Amino acid sequence: MGLFDRIKGPVFLKESNSLQRQLEALENIKTENEEICQLIQQDIRRLKYGIAGEEKIAFELKNSHIPMFVLHDLHIEYEGLSAQIDYLLVTRSRIFILECKNLYGNIEINSNGDFIRTVQYGRGYKKEGIYSPVTQNRRHLDLIKEIIVNRQTNILKKAAVSKFFYDNYKSVVVLANPNTVLNARYAKKEIKNQVIRADRLTEYIKSVNGSDVLINEDAMERYANFFLSLHKENETDYTARYADMIKNAEPAQETWPADTDSVPLCPKCGAVMVKRKAAKGAFAGNEFWGCSNYPRCRYIINISSGNKP
């Protein structure tokens, strides 16, 4: 049997649907509080964006035809430090640590390595700095290096592993949004080489690996299982904070008939109430009376069903 006769393409040793579970949990939250509904919708949009980005990377990997083991969504803790790794790839010659970014807007990397995003607002444009994903992923890589080096008991081997670590482990930031324009014209080469678009991922892996075959299939699988053994479940509970917010939110104490032209006064502060309509969430489209002193007073009165809107 040839060296890579058994593994013909990517093997997903660990897949993740944690973001999907978080999304479903958020979508199931029900509250009449408009402010909380808006915050929930913001989190839902962020999660959907993240899911779309990771699905794009998964598609590229699954269609790469590259023999490798793929670990998706690893949470590693060591010596008080932690790393949340989007994708870890064990290939025949190198190990790749991928940081998936589904960024909106266009991205510029300047000569200092700063990431600057340009977003269009109406007819104008706004520039804003964002935290460098290269720095973020380098910290993930440094933590893995510390783990790998400290596993070596032989002093000479430990020194060798440390010296050649960055030759064998590669940090890559993958931009998943196909509409994002990347301008890295003035970026230093070492930074530029770590940021690619998703549609170049397969080409990048093949280019870095070249014709090198450094480990066999069994060794690849051992490496993959070792990293899998480091994983610790650490799923973010997006619903917990909303449970507290809903519990502490000012509830509607009464209802108001829909078939009347009279306007109620706020039972809490005495201000005139204003008719509003929930724009999002489980009660989207429902009308209610909200205090005109909002946000200082958050009292609401539900409008009971009737013939008059």
Model-derived features: positions:
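Basic/aromatic-rich interaction segments and small domains that mediate binding to polyanionic partners
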Residues: 295
